[in-house]
């Protein structure tokens, strides 16, 4: 039965961002949000409210575990059928894993308590990793990079690692570390929030540490300077993955 009351549904999805101009819908460029909205309008209602994502990924950035919510008038929506139809409709580089009814107070962006990103650095040239990992051939000191990563933990002003100015640049970074898997160096970072371009700039600055262009004291000074021009280069977007978003346990996702 359809009523005037809107009911909220959560979508869990993954996407390869190489051919998209980020998550947020744009007039003249393909985006993840735009593609999903086309599908919802086609299968549900042209007047469906805008789908809301867990964050605004930049152009070229990928997501392994991304969440979004939308509202619809019918709480008895056949989510299995919609899941099947959307996956047939959407391009191959976007996949919907699940669609579930969720409580009305849930918000894909503002209910999140943390987000985790991973950045992939390939130490070996690999044609199958084009637009999926950053190839870097020089040897890096992973131990030094992890010592520097540990300095990021806690409530930190992260304005040194962002292109944009914020009234509040404090981020609560809960974990930050590097690990190696075969020919891949992977940087993992989890925080309650991220500033624009923050992860890519942190990775570039940590690479400078690994190359011994800067030492640990320099890295501390960069953090405390609150000045983007003191930090290192921003690595390419295509090596960055939003790997997870965490929500309070009361939301069964």
Residue ranges and their predicted role:
Residues 1-253:
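Structured-RNA-binding interfaces characteristic of tRNA pseudouridine synthases
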């Amino acid at each position: 039965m359809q009523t005037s009351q809107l009911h909220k549904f959560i979508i869990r999805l993954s996407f390869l961002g190489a051919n998209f101009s980020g998550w947020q819908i744009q007039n003249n460029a393909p985006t993840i949000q735009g593609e999903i909205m086309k599908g919802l309008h086609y299968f549900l209602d042209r007047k469906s409210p805008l789908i809301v994502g867990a964050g605004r990924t930049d152009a070229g950035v990928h997501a392994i575990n991304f969440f979004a919510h939308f509202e619809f008038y019918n709480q008895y929506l056949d989510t299995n059928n919609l899941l099947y139809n959307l996956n047939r409709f959407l391009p191959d580089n976007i996949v919907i894993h699940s669609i579930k009814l969720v409580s009305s107070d849930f918000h894909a962006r503002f209910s999140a308590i943390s987000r985790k990103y991973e950045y992939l650095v390939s130490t070996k040239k690999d044609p199958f990793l084009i637009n999926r990992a950053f190839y870097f051939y020089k040897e890096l000191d992973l131990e030094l990079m992890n010592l520097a990563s540990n300095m990021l933990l806690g409530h930190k002003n992260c304005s040194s690692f962002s292109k944009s100015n914020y009234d509040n640049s404090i981020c609560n970074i809960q974990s930050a570390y590097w690990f190696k898997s075969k020919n891949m160096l992977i940087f993992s970072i989890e925080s309650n929030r991220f500033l624009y371009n923050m992860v890519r700039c942190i990775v570039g600055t940590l690479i400078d540490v690994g190359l011994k262009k800067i030492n640990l004291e320099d890295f501390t000074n960069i953090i405390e300077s609150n000045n983007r021009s003191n930090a290192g280069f921003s690595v390419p977007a295509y090596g960055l993955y939003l790997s997870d978003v965490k929500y309070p346990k009361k939301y069964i996702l």
